[in-house]
Regions:
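Intrinsically disordered, low-complexity proline/glycine-rich segments
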Residues: 1-89
Length: 89
């Protein structure tokens, strides 16, 4: 089972800097990343302003799908995730 992605900790090419969820769900002391969370720009073209694409289909935070380790940003980079907090798909 993949680890949950955390804002300000995990990366998908650049650091996930999410602002989409309203700050209610945490893992390892950091906000859980959700669908459409922005990723820090790390180049040009699709790498300039990517967002996360949640692979989970059944786990939500405030009605928004949760991002897990291995989910992709719109630039194609896979996200890292927690080594000890897991959520289902």
């Amino acid at each position: 089972m993949p680890g949950v992605c955390r804002v300000g900790v995990d990366v998908a090419g650049g650091t996930i800097i999410g602002v989409v969820q309203n700050g209610t769900v945490f893992a390892n002391g950091s906000l859980v990343s959700v669908n459409n969370d922005p990723v820090q720009g790390h180049g040009v073209g699709p790498h300039a302003g990517p967002v996360m694409i949640a692979g989970s289909k059944n786990v939500f935070v405030n009605g928004i799908l949760v991002c897990n380790e291995g989910d992709l940003a719109t630039c194609g980079h896979a996200a890292s995730g927690s080594s000890n907090v897991f959520v289902g798909d």
